[in-house]
Swiss-Prot record:
Phylogenetic lineage: Viruses, Varidnaviria, Bamfordvirae, Nucleocytoviricota, Pokkesviricetes
UniProt-recorded name of the protein: Uncharacterized 7.9 kDa protein
Entry superkingdom: Viruses
Amino acid sequence: MGKVRIFLPLTSLSIEITHPPTELIQSIIVDSLWGIRWYISLSFTTSTLKMLVRSTVSSICLLISSDIIF
């Protein structure tokens, strides 16, 4: 059993080395792209939320000022 335990990781390692590591590189690239996309979407949502809050606050202020003026 001890020999099998030592032999299996060695075979998996040799298989990983012999195979071109394109799948690994692709997975890393995809993960990084997903992370960038999540970051962009989060920043975009926060900026849009800020814009929405600003527009609503400005419209409320305009309504109050128009009520005071008229």
